[in-house]
């Protein structure tokens, strides 16, 4: 920063310095002899880098005495510098008006034709800048749509707003990831279904591929094949053990007339069935 002259005169600055040191001593020590205190400690601090001062003893705070001149007062400002050149005064009185006209005449005499051309060119540039619409700074918050034209211009042009999200975390990216995941799952399921269908078709033969039999179908009437096979089977001879068991059964059955009748009826039915088979 450039140096500036002080705003107060030398006597005023000296008074402020004395008042500041007096009040600082009163706040620190509290004794009445400000000058004597300074004279007593001045010899100890003559050499630079002396020993550190001892720690101050704990004392009870005393009320600060009043200064010689009371509270510090602001000194009057310095008088303006004396010189021949003084700025012209604006308005108020004939002298001011005369000074203003004189200043305008000096300013007009200072500008040449080249300077006037530059001034006119600068003024024309200012007019052009004021008439042309400046580009609005990028907005970080949504702005309302005033008309259809503004909506179209905003949607067709690239957005200047700064994106505060990281890549892959906005709603569109998350939705795209979910859709891609579901599509992959569906593709895997369809692939499994196709494999299952192909394996089922390979395991079950096609009935159209079976060879056709050239023999004519035969109509079965009367006895079935099972009856013919029964006819051909010969009865095995009964062993001695089976004969004894049959005799015992017959002896037991002869005791009851009802059982005898039942056995006779069953034997009659068997004989009739056998006769029918042999007749056929």
Swiss-Prot record:
Q: How is it modified after translation?
A: Phosphorylated at C-terminal serines.
Q: Which UniProt keywords apply?
A: Phosphoprotein
Compositional bias per record (Gly residues), positions renumbered to this chain:
90-100
Region Disordered, residue ranges = 46-167, 200-280
Has UniProt tagged this entry with the keyword Phosphoprotein? yes
- Ranges of Basic residues compositional bias? 227-251
Superkingdom in the source lineage: Viruses
List all Low complexity biased stretches: 252-266
Bias (Acidic residues): 106-117
What residue spans carry the Pro residues bias annotation?
65-81
State what protein this is by name. Probable protein VP2
What is the scientific name of the source organism?
A: Torque teno virus (isolate Human/China/CT23F/2001) (TTV)
């Amino acid at each position: 920063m450039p140096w500036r002259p002080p705003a107060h005169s030398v006597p005023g600055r000296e008074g402020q310095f004395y008042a500041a040191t007096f009040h600082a001593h009163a706040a620190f020590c509290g004794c009445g002899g400000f000058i004597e205190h300074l004279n007593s400690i001045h010899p100890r601090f003559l050499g630079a880098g002396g020993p550190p001062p001892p720690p101050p003893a704990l004392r009870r705070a005393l009320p600060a005495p009043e200064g010689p001149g009371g509270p510090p007062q602001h000194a009057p400002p310095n008088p303006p510098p004396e010189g021949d050149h003084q700025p012209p005064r604006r308005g108020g009185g004939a002298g001011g008006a005369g000074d203003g006209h004189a200043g305008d005449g000096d300013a007009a005499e200072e500008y040449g034709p080249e300077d006037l051309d530059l001034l006119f060119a600068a003024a024309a540039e200012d007019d052009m800048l004021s008439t042309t619409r400046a580009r609005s700074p990028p907005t970080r918050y949504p702005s309302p749509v005033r008309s259809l034209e503004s909506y179209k211009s905003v949607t067709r042009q690239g957005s200047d707003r700064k994106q505060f999200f990281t890549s892959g975390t906005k709603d569109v990216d998350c939705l795209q990831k979910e859709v891609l995941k579901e599509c992959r799952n569906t593709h895997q399921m369809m692939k499994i279904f196709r494999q299952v269908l192909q394996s089922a078709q390979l395991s079950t033969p096609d009935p159209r591929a079976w060879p056709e039999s050239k023999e004519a179908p035969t109509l079965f009437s009367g006895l079935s094949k099972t009856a013919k096979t029964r006819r051909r089977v010969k009865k095995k001879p009964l062993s001695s053990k089976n004969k004894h068991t049959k005799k015992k059964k017959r002896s037991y059955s002869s005791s009851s007339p009802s059982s005898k009748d039942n056995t006779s009826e069953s034997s009659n039915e068997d004989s009739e069935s056998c006769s029918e088979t042999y007749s056929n």
